[in-house]
Amino acid sequence: MQPRSVQIFCRIIDNFGDAGVTLRVARRFLAEGVAPLLISDHLEVLAKLLPGLDPTAPRSVVDGIGVADWDAFAADPDAPADLVLETFGCRLPEKFEERMAVTPPKLTMNLDYLSAEDWVESCHGVWGLHPTLPIRKLWYFPGFTDRTGGLTIEPDYEDRRAAFDREAFLRSLGVTDPSRPTLYFFLYPTNDVVAWARALLSIETPLNVLLAPGEGTDALRDAQTEDRK
């Protein structure tokens, strides 16, 4: 099936992870000639990855990618596209599901998280049924075996990776010594941030620690401050 249009639904709960994955998927569809509409609930996060996006606008188009605010779309949803792509089990807006029941898309899918665990193979490609509406949904799990959905790799990925200047990138973030070991740090607020803070403070080797913004990072900073007292 070659869709002409796709609606991608995303509720952002994972810093830039969810936003980044769905934006990357939207760009791949656009490159294949499929018109994407990305519906998301935290456009201010998406705007950091998509320069030119106004996070206060209920609907916009940036670099060929349509973007819609989740609440605005949920209140007055469009007709279903050829392909409806739910991501990470976010559950579609109720009014939109009602429209899907009347005018079904060619395909409805749930794109789940990338995993190397064995159980993914038995869940990939499985059809699920809506509890009350005549909607069928295909579960798609990316992975690393031929019994999963595999990986999305852009045609120019290797060229861009070869051209990437790691030192210049780190310096642009304020790192003064890019030769040091570098740790990118992200955690949820429910993680044991006190233990992590103490572990980082106990390391004698100088490190560059890149902190992802969010509640978890704020908690880590607080824990480090308390531990130094």
Regions of interest found by a model, annotated:
Residues M1-V6, P142:
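Positively charged, low-complexity intrinsically disordered leader regions
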Residues S5, D82-L83, T182:
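Structural motif
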Residues Q7, L37, M109, Y184, ...:
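A structural signal for isolated positions on well-ordered beta-strands in alpha/beta enzyme cores
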Residues F9-P134:
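Active-site and donor-binding regions of nucleotide-sugar-utilizing enzymes
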Residues G64-G66, K137-W139, D222-K229:
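Active-site regions of enzymes building and remodeling cell-envelope glycoconjugates
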Residues D112-V193:
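A nucleotide-sugar donor-handling region in carbohydrate enzymes
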